[in-house]
Amino acid sequence: MGQNTKIEWTSNGDTPGHTFNIVWGCEKVSPACDRCYAEAWAKRAGFSLWGKGGERRVLSADHWRAPMKWNAAAQKAGKAARVFCSSMADVFEDHPTVSEQRARLWPIVAATPWLQWLLLTKRPENVRGMVPREWLKAWPSNVLPGFTAENQEWFDRRHADAVIDHIDPIVRFPWFVSYEPALGPINFGGMAGISWLIVGGESGGGARPMMLG
């Protein structure tokens, strides 16, 4: 995983996007996690990485060099490339291994201005305390935080955590929302602070119905 991805919303026009994972593994926190594709993918690869006390797979040095190569290619092309981080984990999970690897990520983000980092989380309440402090004074232009919302309950909770509870006079940064999997209707009338909405359903055997609203 990590070279050009087929995830449509990572594309920037005709420039394909990438996925980058700081670890593999996570803990399920809401109904959106119940049929986690990343967990299934990891199990097929022979890894048991899910759960609060579970291990997290740390990735190779070569894997960590990839963003610099993507940045150089984007700069040469004169067009930014998007990077979904992390498709096999949650960057803002409160886990010791994730914390160690997250600290490795921030210097890479700073060194890759031609990459637009899409940091999608189900834990927006953790973002403010886990990003570098200087980001809260001047949010990086190449970083877009996002949160998953599968139904009205989880949109309201995460929107409050992300946009309402954490706004102050120092920083106002835009968020995107992944309404995927769409498990129940959502009234997006109160989308203050949201710059982009992604919509999708589950796929594969046993996929739950897509419930748009």
What are these regions (language model features)?
Residues 63-213:
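Conserved AdoMet/S-adenosylmethionine-binding subsite of the radical SAM
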